[in-house]
């Protein structure tokens, strides 16, 4: 009998009241701020009350460079959390909230798949508890205050040519990348070039995900560089009196959200920065709270390990003082074939030789994660078209690179399909073999940090940048920002900046075409190659297939 679609499986789920789910990890009912029977936010009183608890063990789930459909990282994170609970380890999954952009663009949903899902799936994929709308509103409030300040006399001397803040929208819309605002006459302000990013690329999103509490949130928001004067002096959001109102908009959004897996295990979903154009991790607050209430916390970082895992280690763990105990790299036979040169249309055809050739991508990711001192297990996310010979090939490739590979069937079998993976993860996590350290020191010059990532993670010969980029970095170092980590914005499909360059390329160059100071989030964004901070929709977007049926139920989310 064929397995139902993700949305059909999710609809058949026997969800527990969120209070029952919370009770499994010691969360009392009065600590939950309910959004209906199956969603809740955690109260500040509860978050503060558990800070003295001992931390559980933190497990990162990352992946090889993906196909456009993704390789099942969220599905594996959910499956592993269920698997750990199955073998008696009290476990919480800590995930990012899906963006509407990919839901209506390529993916059609991002709450796991098959029998390894988070529910209520439709709510999570759409508006959820409104956090993204609050982030969008806070971001755009600052944008409105900037233009309003210029309109009413520009007391701070903002140079309209040097406004650093863009508006955002949680949608893929290439038409908004570059616009001219304030057209239509003098009553509408001073026209200037402007543009939109997607909400998940907003610095406000990064700030929310890296803030420890409301006071820290307001401090970071106040430090945002809204723009610069003609003398190139930074104008901060606090100088525009924006940070207080922005904090008010984000007050509830800063509290983590709790939902459940299909097997009724707790999941904290909070924040959702992309890993190709932002830092790609869920909130520090959700992760640290989960660590205080569980034996194990399983979290994921976006796209491949060259992006999400590197940022998880070098930004999130560095800034939050987190020490991961183990990492899981998700690999699929289809993606390895793609890296071995097989066309998308032929990925379902058995081809062990292509798996062998594409295995260099997996081996590179294993080597890279091990550079951080973290033990690695490979999860082979099984598809029905995979052959025994191909799966054996992946195990050989992983073993040669220093990691054990485990076949996982959580999509079809739920926690029963990840029990072996869970036991392997526990073996590594409890062995004490993790010796985590970031890739570079805080004191390293900014461009040297970029170059270090390019050489050691992407295996490039060098990173390049013109004098304007280098001068920006030197200026920020002189202003006291030299200690910040760097956040690389590049394609997710390759180790290089060329999405068509598959496998494990070497001897390539990483061109840095711009750098952006995120003074509130406290990192430097290095924009590499042709990456865009506002995606576009594909020729046939998922939105074409999403609709309500005659019974008023949503169709097309998957």
From Swiss-Prot:
ATP binds at residues 67-74. Disruption phenotype: Mutant cannot degrade vanillate or syringate, but it can degrade protocatechuate and 3-O-methylgallate. Mutant shows O-demethylation activity toward both vanillate and syringate in the presence of tetrahydrofolate, indicating that ligH is not directly involved in the O demethylation of vanillate and syringate. Transmembrane segments: none annotated. One of its GO terms (molecular function) is formate-tetrahydrofolate ligase activity. It is an enzyme of class 6 (ligase). Its EC number is 6.3.4.3. CDD domains: FTHFS. Pathway: One-carbon metabolism; tetrahydrofolate interconversion. Keywords: ATP-binding, Ligase, Nucleotide-binding, One-carbon metabolism. One of its GO terms (biological process) is tetrahydrofolate interconversion. It catalyses: (6S)-5,6,7,8-tetrahydrofolate + formate + ATP = (6R)-10-formyltetrahydrofolate + ADP + phosphate. Coiled coil: none annotated. Belongs to the formate--tetrahydrofolate ligase family. This is Formate--tetrahydrofolate ligase. It comes from Sphingobium sp. (strain NBRC 103272 / SYK-6). The gene is fhs.
């Amino acid at each position: 009998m064929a397995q139902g679609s993700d949305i059909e499986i999710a609809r058949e789920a026997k969800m527990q009241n969120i209070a029952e789910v919370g009770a499994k990890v010691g969360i009392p009912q009065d600590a939950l701020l309910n959004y209906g029977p199956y969603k809740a936010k955690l109260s500040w009183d509860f978050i503060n009350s558990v800070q003295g608890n001992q931390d559980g063990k933190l497990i990162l789930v990352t992946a090889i460079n993906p196909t456009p459909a993704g390789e099942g990282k969220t599905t594996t994170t959910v499956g592993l959390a269920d698997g750990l609970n199955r073998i008696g380890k009290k476990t919480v999954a800590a995930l990012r909230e899906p963006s509407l952009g990919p839901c209506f663009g390529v993916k059609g949903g991002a709450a796991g798949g098959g029998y390894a899902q988070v529910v209520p799936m439709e709510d999570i994929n759409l508006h959820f508890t409104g956090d993204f709308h609050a982030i969008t509103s806070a971001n755009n409030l600052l944008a409105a205050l900037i233009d309003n300040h210029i309109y009413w006399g520009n007391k701070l001397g903002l140079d309209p040519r040097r406004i650093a803040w863009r508006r955002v929208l949680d949608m893929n819309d290439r038409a908004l990348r570059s616009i001219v605002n304030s057209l239509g006459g003098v009553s509408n302000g001073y026209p200037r070039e402007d543009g939109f990013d997607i909400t998940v690329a907003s610095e406000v999103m990064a700030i929310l995900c890296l803030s420890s509490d409301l006071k820290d949130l307001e401090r970071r928001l106040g430090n945002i560089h809204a723009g610069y004067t003609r003398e190139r002096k930074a104008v901060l959001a606090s100088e525009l009196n924006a940070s207080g109102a922005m904090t008010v908009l984000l007050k509830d959004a800063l509290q983590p959200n709790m939902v459940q897996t299909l097997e009724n295990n707790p999941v904290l979903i909070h924040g959702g920065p992309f890993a190709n154009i932002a830092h790609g991790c869920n909130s520090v607050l959700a992760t640290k709270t989960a660590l205080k209430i569980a034996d194990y916390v399983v979290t994921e970082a976006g796209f491949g390990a060259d992006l999400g895992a590197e940022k998880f280690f070098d930004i999130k763990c560095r800034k939050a003082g987190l020490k991961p105990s183990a990492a899981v790299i998700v690999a699929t036979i289809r993606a390895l074939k793609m890296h071995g040169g097989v066309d998308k249309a032929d990925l379902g055809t058995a081809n062990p030789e292509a798996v062998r050739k594409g295995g260099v991508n997996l081996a590179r990711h294993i080597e890279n994660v091990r550079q951080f001192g973290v033990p690695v297990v490979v999860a082979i996310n099984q598809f029905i078209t995979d052959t025994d010979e191909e799966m054996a090939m992946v195990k050989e490739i992983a073993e040669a690179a220093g990691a054990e590979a485990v076949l996982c069937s959580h999509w079809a079998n739920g926690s029963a399909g990840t029990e072996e993976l869970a036991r392997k993860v526990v073996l590594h996590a409890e062995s004490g073999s993790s010796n985590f350290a970031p890739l570079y020191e805080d004191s390293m010059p900014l461009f040297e940090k970029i170059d270090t990532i390019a050489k050691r993670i992407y295996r490039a010969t060098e990173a390049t940048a013109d004098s304007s980029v280098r001068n920006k970095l030197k200026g920020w170092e002189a202003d006291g920002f030299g200690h910040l980590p760097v956040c690389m914005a590049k394609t997710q499909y390759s180790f290089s900046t060329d999405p068509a360059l598959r496998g494990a390329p070497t001897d390539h160059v990483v061109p840095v075409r711009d750098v952006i100071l995120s003074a509130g989030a406290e990192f430097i964004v290095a924009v590499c190659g042709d990456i865009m901070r506002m995606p576009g929709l594909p020729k046939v977007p998922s939105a074409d297939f999403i609709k309500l049926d005659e019974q008023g139920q949503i169709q097309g989310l998957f």
